[in-house]
A protein has these predicted regions:
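Extracellular loop and loop/strand-boundary signature of outer-membrane beta-barrel proteins
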Residues: 49-53, 93, 143-146, 182-185, ...
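Detector for outer-membrane/organellar transmembrane beta-barrel domains
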Residues: 190, 195-314, 325-327
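Residues that define the transmembrane beta-barrel architecture of outer-membrane proteins
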Residues: 49-63, 100-103, 152-156, 191-195, ...
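Outer-membrane beta-barrel "beta-signal"
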Residues: 316, 359-375
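Outer membrane beta-barrel
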Residues: 22-37, 52-179, 191-193, 200-204, ...
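Gram-negative outer-membrane beta-barrel proteins
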Residues: 35-43, 87-93, 125-127, 178-182, ...
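Gram-negative bacterial Sec-dependent N-terminal signal peptides
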Residues: 1-22
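Outer-envelope beta-barrel architecture signal
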Residues: 23-29, 71, 75-79, 113-117, ...
């Protein structure tokens, strides 16, 4: 009897080992927190200038956690899934949407030869700008001057990622509105049609990428705001020179013109052109120094703004790092871009919410130092 029990235990363990070899699920995450100082903030009434200290989560990178899994189906085919949600390390609360998996929730099939097809919620394709931003679209970066447009996540997505062939790969997305209106979602919904295509070429010396994408207004299906519902054209390049990485990019946000939401004004900006450049110096295996300049120009009297920033990271281990960033944004007389990716509109307290945009023509300056751990 004892021998039978032993053989049964061995058989069960062997079966578990085979199942483990065929499929896997990985828990991963990142916690980011630090102390931030910012000057040039508006008063509650939108005038004047003030400053503050605060603990902040996500300045260097979004705090997040997730699950991803793969099942080997044989013949080079795999079933894959990913679930990912954001949260605040400072408060423990969920991301801004309040959803558990507000960043990613998808499932699909992958093939070593033919690529990967996914269905579900995903990072909008414009997040591909990240690879060409010296500060990785952190809080004070290219995202600030397009007011967070390139941080978007889209639901009801169908995407395809090709394998890399001779240095080239392509990626495409199509997000359904899930409505009888082809472009717009149901009334009150947060989903309009989205789509985009991306082509990348990579070798040991350089990398280049081009992206075209659309984000439609969920209420009317129009392209009616350069920062929330527009077409974007992007081209970026990375140059790898030993310990140095040189990065540069250009984006153009375009609407269909007419009345721009949410301002309701025919004279609000209908275009935004942004360019940036920067250098990362890998001083040691653990320490990196970064410097970058970002500039945006809008039409219809919306003005222009420039962010100057330096920073760096020091890796205490493969999973833990210290980070620091110093930045300032300079606005022309009619522009009011902040260091953070704030919504459009005047700064100050409006409808119970505080908008950090400075007074038009004023600047903001900030310093951030924090710690980040990945698992």
């Amino acid at each position: 009897m004892r021998l039978k029990r032993t053989l049964l235990a061995v058989a069960l363990m062997s079966a578990g080992a085979v199942a483990h070899a065929q499929s896997s699920v990985t828990l991963y995450g990142r916690l980011d927190a630090g102390i931030e100082y910012m000057s040039g903030l508006p008063g509650n009434n939108g005038t004047g200038s003030t400053s503050r200290w605060r603990q902040e989560s996500g300045d260097w990178g979004t705090s997040l956690w997730g699950l991803k899994g793969v099942e080997d189906l044989g013949g080079g085919n795999k079933a894959v899934f990913q679930l990912e949600g954001a949260f605040s390390t400072a408060t423990g609360s969920l991301g801004l949407s309040g959803s558990l998996f507000d960043r990613i929730a998808n499932v699909g099939l992958a093939n070593d030869t033919f690529g990967t097809v996914l269905l579900g919620r995903q990072l909008q394709i414009a997040n591909g700008d990240w690879d060409f931003d010296p500060f990785g679209q952190s809080n004070w970066s290219s995202a600030s001057l397009v007011r967070g447009r390139n941080w978007e996540h889209t639901s009801n997505n169908i995407s395809y990622q090709s394998p890399k062939i001779d240095g080239f790969d392509v990626y495409g997305q199509y997000g359904l509105s899930n409505s009888t209106d082809f472009n717009a979602g149901v009334p009150g919904a947060a989903t309009g049609r989205t789509d985009g295509a991306q082509v990348t070429y990579t070798n040991s010396l350089f990398q280049v990428r081009g992206i075209y994408d659309e984000i439609r207004d969920p209420l009317n299906g129009q392209l009616d705001n350069p920062f929330t519902a527009s077409r974007e054209y992007f081209v970026g390049a990375n140059l790898f020179l030993g310990q140095f990485k040189v990065q540069a990019a250009y984006t153009a946000e375009r609407t269909s013109g007419g009345v721009i939401t949410p301002t309701g004004s025919p004279t609000a900006p209908t275009t935004a052109d942004m360019e940036w450049g920067g250098v990362t110096y890998q001083a040691t295996a653990a320490a990196a120094l970064i410097a970058a300049v970002y500039h945006v120009n809008t039409n219809n009297g919306g003005g222009n703004a420039t962010i100057y920033t330096i920073g760096g990271a020091y890796n205490l281990s493969k999973r833990t790092l210290f980070d620091i960033q110093i930045a300032t944004v300079r606005n022309s007389s009619t522009a009011n871009f902040g260091l953070d990716a704030n919504n459009e509109g005047p700064g100050g307290l409006t409808d119970g919410a505080f908008n950090e945009n400075p007074v038009p023509g004023h600047s903001q300056t900030g310093v951030y130092a924090g710690i980040q751990h990945s698992f």
